[in-house]
Amino acid sequence: MRIHPFQGLVPVPALAPEVACVPYDVVNTAEAAALAAGRPHSLLHVDRAEIGLPPATDPYSDAVYSRARANFDSLQRGGTLVRETGPCLYVYQQRMGDHVQRGLVAGCHVEDYDAELIKKHEKTRKDKEDDRTRLIDTLSADTGPVS
């Protein structure tokens, strides 16, 4: 498997707690809206952009992806998300109770994924994969640690 550093977009440290959010697929639209209420810097406005549209909006409609792009651009223009000065590898740590796990975020080669050298995230659903792929294509960025 081949990995490489990449020049990511990161929140400015003072706003990082406001940008951070739960994974898009652990909350429904109403829960995402409640979590993002009063938090204009929350990445939920990108990952679950339907929360800023009328309630009857299809979460897979063009309007949602357009809104996600507009919100993502706004976070960059407003200085909430800034580009790293050079390529980086990102180490992270997650804790739940006594369990701690660490990971690495890096660029990789699609060919390695296609050759099954990269383990696929467990229990993925085709509709969710298609949604995240469309969001990544729309943003020209991946806003989640697992894709």
Regions found by a protein language model. Name each.
Residues M1-S147:
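A cross-family signal for N-terminal binding/gating loops and helix N-caps
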